[in-house]
Amino acid sequence: MTLRTENLTVSYGTDKVLNDVSLSLPTGKITALIGPNGCGKSTLLNCFSRLLMPQSGTVFLGDNPINMLSSRQLARRLSLLPQHHLTPEGITVQELVSYGRNPWLSLWGRLSAEDNARVNVAMNQTRINHLAVRRLTELSGGQRQRAFLAMVLAQNTPVVLLDEPTTYLDINHQVDLMRLMGELRTQGKTVVAVLHDLNQASRYCDQLVVMANGHVMAQGTPEEVMTPGLLRTVFSVEAEIHPEPVSGRPMCLMR
């Protein structure tokens, strides 16, 4: 399911955060949105999910403008792990993950056997099944992040949006998450993630979208995008590009 924008503009007061952004993201691939703080990455992701409405321009999901879809229709096609979460008081991990099935519930509002199976799969994928009966408020930041990720996975949508998903995660769980994104790709899902680690983005993602000052500066494969000149222009750093020893993907080394 293709996700694309046409002439998207978003302003906060007099500041344009996105300026006439048009792009199309590849279906069934992992795309990373990268760029310096304040460049518009999270704003773009929020426009994709309809959490934020643009001043002008359109977001399309497949052939449909997303503003023409009902909330239920959109939630069956697209899921979002936001950058910040409100942690509900008193609920367990399993209850939180079950919320991901809400778009699929019948009129009776009860979880079916398939719903429960999806919840269990999501908890296993994120390695939190042993935390199922723990309350969210008892968990560490990293454990909570994995619980919210499991809720998104339980939603089982063809498009998955992740806003800084490695926040709070130890390095082993960061690697797990990146590999999990690859598993979602093999299932035919389109994954779009805001990432700060350029080398992680290069190693694990199929496409990079580089943003700066509300504009798309470059889009393409890591080999096409990760160049010393672009890093100098966008991030104001001097870097060398070398093949990463394991994957062979471009890796930047700061001078």
UniProtKB/Swiss-Prot annotation:
Membrane topology: Peripheral membrane protein
Catalysed conversion reaction: iron(III) dicitrate(out) + ATP + H2O = iron(III) dicitrate(in) + ADP + phosphate + H(+)
InterPro entries assigned to the protein according to its UniProt record, in alphabetical order: AAA+_ATPase, ABC_transporter-like_ATP-bd, ABC_transporter-like_CS, P-loop_NTPase, Siderophore_ABC-ATPase
Enzyme class label: translocase
Induction / repression: Induced 1.6-fold by hydroxyurea.
Subcellular locations according to the entry: Cell inner membrane
Main location: membrane
Binding site for ATP: 35-42
GO cellular component: ATP-binding cassette (ABC) transporter complex, substrate-binding subunit-containing; membrane; plasma membrane
A GO BP entry: intracellular iron ion homeostasis
ABC transporter domain mapped to chain residues: 3-238
Pfam families: ABC_tran (PF00005)
GO molecular function: ATP binding; ATP hydrolysis activity
Keyword set, alphabetical order: ATP-binding, Cell inner membrane, Cell membrane, Ion transport, Iron, Iron transport, Membrane, Nucleotide-binding, Translocase, Transport
EC number: 7.2.2.18
Record-stated family: Belongs to the ABC transporter superfamily.
Description of how the protein assembles with itself and partners: The complex is composed of two ATP-binding proteins (FecE), two transmembrane proteins (FecC and FecD) and a solute-binding protein (FecB).
Function: Part of the ABC transporter complex FecBCDE involved in citrate-dependent Fe(3+) uptake. Binds ATP. Probably responsible for energy coupling to the transport system.
The name this protein goes by in its record: Fe(3+) dicitrate transport ATP-binding protein FecE
Natural source organism: Escherichia coli (strain K12)
Lineage summary: Bacteria, Pseudomonadati, Pseudomonadota, Gammaproteobacteria, Enterobacterales
